Amino acid sequence: MLTNTLMLVRTHPQDMAREDEFNEWYTGNHVPDVLHAPGLTAALRYKLAMTHIGEVPPYLALYYIDNDDATDANNGMMAYLNAPDPKRMVMPEATGQGDEWKIHGAGGGTRPGGLISVDTWAYYTKTLEVGENDVSPDNAAEGLLVTYTAPAADADVDALNKWYDWHMDDIISTPGIRGGARYKIASVNAGEATQFVGIFELETDDVEKVAGDLGATLATAPSGGIPTTESGASALDIFGFAYYKLESAPTKEHTLLP
């Protein structure tokens, strides 16, 4: 069973020529550091493989927090990150002039831009979990399908959510997809985030095959197509529909130290 609170972070290297350095710091020092924050149970990093809808940042980090109160979880995280730690390495400096970014809320403020450019730092609350999910380092999903969505302005939200819950059962009936969860936004620390995120775990990194099989599944799925509004438009706004491959499954053990 997945935790009810998810911290989702999307990033990209400020300088793609230094992508290896970006990943070395992120996987070797930063994620193991964050895993020592209160309530953290697991963290996984994924790299974008292909996008069917929208423009999606190339890196996704998922942090699972055993605290049902997302606000309290964030407060604990900020207090931890603002306290000194001898094993913590500062973010590598940008190439040239980095872009400053702002963290909202208490303990935040404007931060100097470094090699890691933050597109999204947000907390989500789980609304539904289906199938078999495992975020442990030894059995992390080899790939993900992630949907970034929101109800359309004039959608019947209750009806749409009921359909989406049914739709999730259809998705995980696809060969190669073992489980999934849907999350609703709780708060945004930095960047932009969609109201809902659907995360589906893949048993394979052959995302092209899974995408083809999913298309075949949904063509005859019992849940049918996306509901429409009274005007006939789609009741669901889709800002991103993307497949990822596992980049790393860090533990609390640092592999990169100052």
Write out the residue ranges for each language-model feature.
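Macromolecular interaction modules
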Residues: 1-258
